[in-house]
Amino acid sequence: MARQLAILLLFAVAMAGIATVGSIESASAAGAIGGQFTLGAVLDESVGWFIVVGLGAVFAVVISLEIKIEEKYLGVTKTSEWFNTAGRVIKTGLTAAAIVSAWTWAATLLQSSTVAYQYGVSGPFWYAAGASVQVLLFGILAIELKRKAPNAHTFLEIIRARFGDAAHRVFLVFALMTNMIVTAMLLLGGAAVVNGLTGMNISIAAFLIPIGVMIYTLVGGLKATFVADYMHTIVIFAVILTFVSTVYFISPVTGGVQGMYDKLVQAAAINPVQGNAAGAYLTMASLGGLIFGIINLVGNFGTVFVDQAYWQRAIAARPSSTVKGFLLGGMCWFAIPFTLATTMGLTAVALGVTLTPEQVQLGLTVPAAASVLMGEVGAIMVLTMLFMAVTSAGSAELIAVSSLITYDVYRTYRNPNATGKQLLKVSRGVIVGFGLGMGGLAVILLSIGLSLGFVYLAMGVLIGSAVIPIALTITWKRTNKYAATAGAIVGLFAALGAWIGTAVALPQYGGVVSIASLGDNFSMLYGNVTGILVGGAITGFGSLGKRSTFEWTDISKKITLVESSSAASVSQADQDEATLKRAFRFSLKGGGLMTLVLIIGWPLPLFFSGYVFDVGFYGLWVGIAVVWVSTATFFIVGLPIIEARHGISKIARRQRAVAEEATGVEK
């Protein structure tokens, strides 16, 4: 049912895109296309309330119904294991869709276009490449989890089984801090855009956005978030395809590829980009873009490797689908920021959209470009797309925090003999508590003047030091608890020292520590890089001094299921060691090769050559973006339906049998 409704949603959004063709000329005639964006003046405030409350309620009802139908017709039993692991039987397509959705934050849609507006074509590329390789490489850890801890509910259970309570508590702090940072970014971006387009009170928006998410997550747990991920991702891809079609193939205002090229060349002549070759927007030779790329690359390792949401997707996936799901998800996700920002971020530049520095930092480039180009239709589409991203990624964070508190706090320290019913009750209580607290956190950050852009760049400073210790704990037999714990803690303080020290040393800020000096690219760069390198060095060198006698089989003995289930037994039957080793080797080769291409082989020759795109190369660049997002849409929309065909037909047969029984018809 949910997948059929998702297809209808795709059709509806596509029809809205077609209707946009006629709206562009009328918007132009009305003066909508004039390069000006007025905060809060694009849409009526009632539209904001409809999206935040009305659309949230619709998705909460639809997704809850889908979960109830699965329970009724597929015999799904709602236990604490099922609630937090989705039965460990999710297939490749839905795993990939869930990864794409969980990794599509407000920042994916907003910050990627911000750096396009600031640095030109290099911004979208470095955002996409610098944030997709983590997912590609995480596939290695995901399959190692399947091999070494098939019964795990969280990655922290593995740390405790190997290193004990002290290390477990340290990494629990890092994990919860990661969830808070990601949640804050989601709501900062979402509330800012709702306020910027409709004038709805930003604090009220921040409080209301999580409510619908909270409802369907309460009903269906992790499986509900997977269903929501799929449906929301369809809408996001449909909106992006509509923008691409409008800018490059339909709109007379942008003039297609040739028109965009001419406008971007003219924009660079009027306002050259400092640090870019020839001041051009159409070049990868951008110092600012490269610095952002490094910060982005380092910072995002923390928000994947230290975020329970991604470990939870690895836990929920079938062992045979884990690596394929992460590799496919990573490559499909690349298309979202790369194509959207290459399209809408550069459209804002081409049309001369004027934004204040504060509006840029709030991430309002995409809504401004869509509003100026397409009027109210564009604004509504951006608002809908952003709401989909915030709520789907938000649901992933909700269930992640729920699992951490349930299994790593309550079951570990409060009630080791807890029953499944007790754990389920705790899980739901945490969802309500964290769901209500999410908005409060965003309001606090807004009140002290922190924007989406600032929090996005600072996250690696705060959590990057835990990345390598966690990765080595899962993959390296010689890692010891003292080195891993010290690496995470000392790395954090070293990162903070480098961050603050650089901010003080920058002469343009007069030696004052402020949001402006801390938000400078060089302050962020040194803080992010210091954290991950110091944490990794202490863990690596500290572990070399002592040979470990640890056996991986000890982990699986220490981590047990709360309840046995048919889903769990299916997962165990899929747990063939030879198959998992082949998957591990494939993840090393596939993830490693794609990382080298995206970080070195593709961008660096273009950077060092100083090449400025001509119209032909720009057309090729746009063509790659269009083909990539179209292919990604095909896989993310189509593959889950293909893989779910047997379940769909089973539901249809049982519904038909029930209907025939009710009407007294003989089979």
Language model features with spans:
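Membrane-embedded helix-loop-helix hairpins and adjacent transmembrane boundary segments
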Residues: 2-667
